Amino acid sequence: MIHGKTLEAWQQSHPIIADLVALKETSWFNPGIAQASEALRDVGLTAADVQAASARLQRFAPYLATVFPETAPAGGIIESHIAPLPLLRQRLIEEGALRNAGSLWLKADSDLPVSGSIKARGGIHEVLKHAEDLALAAGLITPTDDYTRLASEQARAFFGQYKIAVGSTGNLGLSIGIMSAKLGFQVSVHMSSDARQWKKDKLRANGVTVVEHASDYSVAVEQGRQQAAADPSCYFVDDENSPQLFLGYAVAAERLALQFDQAGIQVDADHPLFVYLPCGVGGGPGGVAFGLKLVFGDAVHCIFAEPTHSPCMLLGVYTGLHDETSVQDFGIDNITAADGLAVGRPSGFVGKAMQRLIDGYYTVTDEALYRLMVIAHEQDKVKLEPSALAGVPGMLRVLQADEYLARQGFTPTQLQQATHLVWGTGGSMVPEDEFNAYLAKGRSV
C-alpha cells in the first residue's frame, strides 16, 4: 500500500504513474497553474527578499574578488554567460520534426566561478548571509564597511569558532564547502552514495571535512541536520527547506534580464520564454523559477527536468503528496548517472510554493543524457555533466505537447518568436579524464 492506496489504484487515478514506474520518458504539463500575480503569493517570499539577497551579494563582491581572483574581472559578482545553441537546435528540430521552433540558448551556470555549478548561487549566498549575521552581531563590520575586511586573519579566526554542515549529492556541497572554508568556518559536507569521487577530493583539498554515507541524498541531509542539532555552534544549510538558498538562486533572473537586453532578446506575451531547469530536490530550479516569474511574469514558462529513475518533484506535485512521498514508495530506485538529480523525496517547501508557477515536468533517461552530452560537446562545444543535460530535450517536449500548447493558446507566430533557454547546471570542473569517460559512454549508447 502507498499512502492508503494500491499501486494499481494510483495508476488508475493518476495514469502517468504507470509510465513513471516503468521508467519511461514522461511529460506532464500541470493544468492547475495560475497567473503569476496570483500564484506568486503562494511562495511566502517577495521581490523585496530577492533584492535583499542581491544587495548582499553586491556588498560581498569586493571580498569575493579578493579571495577568489577568478571573480575579479566581474568585480566579484559570480555570474555566467548565455550562448546560442544553433547546432543542437537544428538537431532537435530534425529529431522531432518540429515546426515553429524559436531560438535555443544555454545559460552556462556550468561555468560559474568558485564551484562550477548553479549551486554557487544559492550555496554561496546562504554562507555569506550567515557570515554577515555573525560578523555584524560581533561588531566586526557594519553594513556600510568594505567587506574585504572579512579576508583578514582576525575575521578568519572569528569564523573558525563556528561550524557549518550540509548534506549533498555533490554540487551544493562544493559551493558550501569551498565558501565556508575560505571564510574560516569549520565545515562538514555529508555526501550521499552517488556523489562523484572528484567532488569529494576537491572538497578535502579545500580543507573541508567530507562525511561519506552509503545511503542516498535524504539520509545525507538528515545526518547533517542531526550533527547541527547536537551542536549550538553549528549552522545547518537545509537543502530541503531553505529560503536563503532559494533567494540566492532567484537573483539570477534580474541578471538574465540584463543579458537578454544586451543580446536583443525580447520577452513578452508575443515573445514567450521557455526555461528548462534540471531538478533534484528542487531548491535551485525553484528559486530560479521564482525569480524569473517575478521579472517576466506570465511571459516565462518554467519546466522542470528529472531523470527517469528520480522523478521526485513530478511525482510529488502530480500526486499532491509532495515530500510525504518518495520515488522509492512507488518502486523507483533513485539510481541515476545524473548524480546532482539523484533525489528520491522532493522539497515540500518548493513543491507547495511553486506548484502553480511551474508549467510542466518531464523525465529523461541516463542514456539520453549521455547521448546529448556528446552532441552538445561536438556540435556546440559545450562541456556539461550528465545532470546538466536534462534541460536540453525541453524544447522538443514542449513543442510536441499539443494539448498544453492549445491550453495556453500559443499561436504559430508566438512559438516562432519564442526563446528556449536550457539551464546548464554544472560541468566545467569535471576532470578531463572523467569527462572523456562520459563522452565514450555517450558514443556507445
Curated annotation (Swiss-Prot):
GO terms for molecular function: D-serine ammonia-lyase activity; hydro-lyase activity; pyridoxal phosphate binding. Its cofactor is pyridoxal 5'-phosphate. One of its GO terms (biological process) is D-serine catabolic process. It comes from the Bacteria. InterPro entries: D_Ser_am_lyase, Ser/Thr_Dehydratase, Ser/Thr_deHydtase_PyrdxlP-BS, TrpB-like_PALP, TrpB-like_PALP_sf. The lineage of its organism: Bacteria, Pseudomonadati, Pseudomonadota, Gammaproteobacteria, Pseudomonadales. Keywords: Lyase, Pyridoxal phosphate. Its EC number is 4.3.1.18. The keyword Lyase applies. This is Probable D-serine dehydratase. The gene is dsdA. The modification N6-(pyridoxal phosphate)lysine is found at K119. SUPFAM superfamilies: Tryptophan synthase beta subunit-like PLP-dependent enzymes (SSF53686). It comes from Pseudomonas putida (strain GB-1). Belongs to the serine/threonine dehydratase family. DsdA subfamily. It catalyses: D-serine = pyruvate + NH4(+). Pfam families: PALP (PF00291). NCBIfam families: D_Ser_am_lyase, PRK02991.1.
